Amino acid sequence: MSSLLPPHAQILVVGGGPAGSYCASILAREGFSVVVLEATTFPRYHIGESMLPSVRPFLKFSGADNKIASHGFCPKPGAAVKFQQHKREGYTDFSTLSSGNSPDNAAAWNVKRSEFDEILLRHAEELGAQVFENHRVINLIFADNNVSEGRPISAEFSCPNGELRSISFDYLVDASGRAGIMSTKYLKNRKFNNTLRNVASWGYWTGAKRYMPGSERDNAPFFEALTDGSGWAWFIPLHDSTVSVGIVTDQASSTARKALSARNGMHCSSKADYLAQLKLAPTVSGKFLCKATLQGENSPTCIRSASDFSYAADRYSGDHFRLIGDASAFIDPFFSSGVHLALLGALTAAASISASIRKTCSELRAAQFHDKKVAIAYTRFLLVVMGVYKQIRNQDLHILAEVDEDNFDRAFDILRPVIQGTADVGKTVSEDELQKTMDFCKDIFAPTDPQMHEAVGARLGPELCSPSVPIMTDSEIEDLTKDDNEAKLVLKEINARKAVHTMYGGPIHVAAESIDGLVLNLEVGNFGLKNVH
């Protein structure tokens, strides 16, 4: 922790989680003055242990990847997803993105967030950010007292001794997590997704069996739909030999379940409810946990729980401020997208602030760049997750009111001709198009495996199984595969991944997509935004 808190910061970052620490790292490396105010003292507990492969290239850009790789976190070779009990699970293989299934070479990891997050925060300090823990921001002050359209200029915060102080700043980055001080207290623009109002409960187990131990899939997380269609379970191995096991169900089902227990004169504890729901994931409970022990099972706090409501906002930036991480938006954790979205938003916030300071573009254009990048990334993952829930609940999810039309256009522009069957697509997004997009995206989790991919490639030719082949329509896949159902599954999975897997490239992918004539400039020392030539 830094020793002396200055009265003014060029850039104030509120929150030291992955979003805040990553943004602070990049800006400090560029030579800007950065102060981070973190409400808690690290290390601190946090859920969200499963990472996407994109996290590694993001961390490589900030220089933190070797610290994470050498820490000993559990390598994540892929992920298994089981939607239906009478069908095999699907498996996403990350091996092609890594140089080996060891922590140092892994494409992704399962992490303990208390350790992962602290490494990133200390890295920000090493690069020059001034970090102050146990300093909680309480209020923001705006120029001309204009909250709705004004510019935040200072923050009031509490110190460890309880003293209230203030700090002024030129730029504000709100990385305050779900509390989201800008969005909830001042902009008042947080909008919850009515379809994804879920609750989560979880605990940690010892002595659990693993998914395919001794194989190339060893340590892969396993995700399983509950048999009653109310949600899903996660099973995530960690490097301390424990396993994180959680249940996500929709709030309505959870409330009804507890009300029924109350009417029957039964008090349903968090632990009893968790164990009862776990039985609805027979592979996780019956196969992996059959001889396992719940950590602290005699403690009333052995089961943790949290609301799992997905939300977004109508904007994530403004005059000299940016919103990132959970302070900006949050989406259901099925796709393990939390840290990915945090780092992506942190990157674009840092780039837009750098561009504004260096005057390579106006503050307005810079803010809008960040705003649209966050919205596009959120929309992509939203449609993937909604496609998953459409399968889990076995029903159409009418989400037209949940999706911003402009964000959909930007996020899925390459899919619209494929989905609608013509290059001359309409400009207005329809409910039918959203349903087809969700159906397209759900094939990301088709029940295939690497051996099936290899066999289909041998039959149809490896070029058809290449991710570089243009996205195909359903009719094109039908013509190619005929009655070969295995090939149909493989091609549909590959097809769906083309719209999502480019994001695994981290900063390079973010830099490749232009917004209103601007792209990221990833050159260290000149980091920011530049015009597309």
Curated annotation (Swiss-Prot):
Chloride binds at residues 337-338. Keywords: FAD, Flavoprotein, Monooxygenase, Oxidoreductase. FAD binds at residues 16, 19, 49, 339. The keyword Oxidoreductase applies. Pfam families: Trp_halogenase. Coiled coil: none annotated. This is Flavin-dependent halogenase armH4. It comes from Armillaria mellea (Honey mushroom).
